[in-house]
């Protein structure tokens, strides 16, 4: 990682570590070594330590004095809170759709759906298109900037979503749901769009129950539990 001024460098390290947690590169429950992280990024321990503190404030990292730092396990309660916020905002944005939709944004969404249908997409490419699709729908309502607030609050939700994507052989079911939402929006059928959106967003809860049945170690059960210092593999 290129060295810049101190403030920029710390921000870059924080964003990098946050992304590693959200993409499951740093798995739920994994032990975190400040020395190893600093060495891998070519920086001192100080900005790494500061970044871990910020991530702890977001609930993405747990710091136990004299024991160490660990990636927080996915917390179903935090997932539910983030889902509640996201659903309220996205359904509200559908209610706020104007009678005349911006043709440029509609075109972007249509192109996005075409790219989602590609067979060679990896998980992160699809996840990025998924995020852009939902943000685009909010832009249609004139509230695209609200997505920043939603995105900042859904760290645990995004990890659960990624776990769900890894469980599915193909994202085709999600693409079909996106198309149903898009068609309802462009046809002016807001009630149908709301129903389709609600079904789509709540699918994550089924994913959590299915994954927790065979990989309970990825999920939080008791916030007071001190973890064992070991690494957890999400998948082989």
Swiss-Prot record:
Transcription keyword on record = yes
Q: Kindly give the Gene3D superfamilies that the UniProt entry links to this protein.
A: GntR ligand-binding domain-like, Winged helix-like DNA-binding domain superfamily/Winged helix DNA-binding domain
Q: Which SUPFAM superfamilies match?
A: GntR ligand-binding domain-like (SSF48008), Winged helix' DNA-binding domain (SSF46785)
**DNA-binding positions:** 34-53
Q: Which InterPro entries match?
A: GntR_C (IPR011711), TF_FadR/GntR_C (IPR008920), Tscrpt_reg_HTH_GntR (IPR000524), WH-like_DNA-bd_sf (IPR036388), WH_DNA-bd_sf (IPR036390)
Taking every annotated instance into account, which residue ranges of this chain make up the domain HTH gntR-type?
Answer: 7-74
Q: Which UniProt keywords apply?
A: DNA-binding, Transcription, Transcription regulation
Molecular function as annotated in GO: DNA binding; DNA-binding transcription factor activity
Q: Which Pfam families match?
A: FCD, GntR
Q: Would the keyword Cell wall biogenesis/degradation be found if you checked this record's keyword annotation?
A: no
**What is the official name of this protein in its record?**
Uncharacterized HTH-type transcriptional regulator in unstable DNA locus
């Amino acid at each position: 990682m290129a060295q810049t001024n101190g403030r920029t460098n710390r921000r870059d390290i924080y964003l990098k570590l946050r992304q590693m947690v959200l993409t499951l590169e740093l798995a739920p429950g994994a032990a975190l070594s400040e020395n190893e992280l600093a060495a891998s990024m070519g920086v001192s321990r100080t900005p790494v330590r500061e970044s871990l503190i910020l991530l702890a404030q977001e609930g993405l990292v747990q710091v136990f004095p004299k024991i160490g730092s660990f990636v927080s396990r996915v917390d179903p309660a935090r997932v539910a809170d983030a889902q509640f916020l996201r659903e309220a905002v996205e359904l509200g944005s559908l209610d706020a759709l104007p009678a005349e939709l911006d043709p440029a944004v509609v075109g972007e969404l249509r192109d996005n759906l075409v790219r989602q249908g590609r067979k060679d997409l990896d998980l992160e490419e699809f996840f990025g298109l998924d995020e852009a699709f939902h943000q685009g729908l909010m832009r249609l309502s004139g509230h695209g900037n609200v997505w920043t607030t939603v995105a900042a609050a859904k760290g645990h939700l995004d990890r659960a979503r990624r776990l769900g994507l890894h469980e599915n052989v193909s994202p085709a079911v999600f693409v079909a749901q996106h198309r149903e939402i898009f068609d309802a929006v462009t046809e002016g059928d807001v009630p149908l769009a709301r129903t389709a959106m609600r079904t789509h967003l709540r699918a994550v809860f089924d994913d959590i129950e299915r994954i927790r049945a065979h990989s309970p170690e990825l999920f939080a059960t008791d916030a007071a539990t001190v973890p064992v210092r070991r690494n957890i593999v999400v998948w082989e």
